[in-house]
Amino acid sequence: MRSKGVRSRVLSLDDFFVGEGRYPKQPDGRDDYECVEALDIPLVQHCLQQLAQTGVCDAPIFDFMTQLPAPQTQHIDCTDGVVVVEGLHAFNPILTETLPQDAVLNIYASLREEYAGPDGARLIATRDVRLARRITRDWRFRGHDADFTIGLWPHVCKAEDQYIKTFKNRANLVLDTSFSCEVGIWEYYIDQLTASANAGRMADLRSRFAHFVPINAALIPQKSMLREFIGAENQ
């Protein structure tokens, strides 16, 4: 949007996590990072209301290394512009119900592309591509190894069905975020990582991406959406 002259900023709901010691619990006693209550809901509502009314807000920053909100905030000034709110619960009406309807455009972003071999059989599921994205992002930016991400993955998929697909019919637009080349990127990264507690799942994932030629991440354009998962070239 910026390249088209539209003033824009991204507001990630991940920055609104309540933090270590305050997360709701799953039935097995583990922290539940996926439910909407894992976010500071009143603070999300306040920031969105401020943006809708004035175009300006001071939003939190979450430190994934300490698993706590950072002491500093981020000043977002998008007066006469667009704020892209991204996150698992961005469609949840509990966050946006107090906003003017004409202030919100819901875009459902998901992977739609499938990959098949010469015999027509599916080589890899879209959820495997999403898992590879998340493993790479968590490893590079959130201080988590592959074991942590794979162990959490069944709960993530359950949360997707419960919290995203439930509100999919609220979408004004559907955006396919697939990149035909990205399977080669994940082959490049997944081949570097190991998992001990989830070695079998990691081996299965690696075997699926082994069908594709690795692509060096340096070849990905700096403005590509894939940089969300792999970072800038110099990171």
Regions found by a protein language model. Give the residues of each.
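Conserved nucleotide-sensing/catalytic segment adjacent to the nucleotide-binding pocket
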Residues: 9-11, 18-68, 82
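Short gly/ser/thr-rich secondary-structure transition/capping motifs
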Residues: 63-71, 155-158
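Short beta->alpha connector loops
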Residues: 88-91
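Post-Walker A helix-loop "phosphate-sensing" segment adjacent to the P-loop in P-loop NTPases
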Residues: 1-10
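Short loop/turn elements that form and flank the Walker-type P-loop nucleotide-binding site
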Residues: 77-79, 101-102
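Structural recognition of the conserved hydrophobic beta-strand(s) that form the central parallel beta-sheet
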Residues: 82-86, 107-108
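Conserved NTP phosphate-binding and transfer environment spanning the P-loop NTPase/kinase superfamily
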Residues: 93-235
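A short acidic-Thr-Gly-centered motif at the start of a beta-strand
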Residues: 2, 74-78
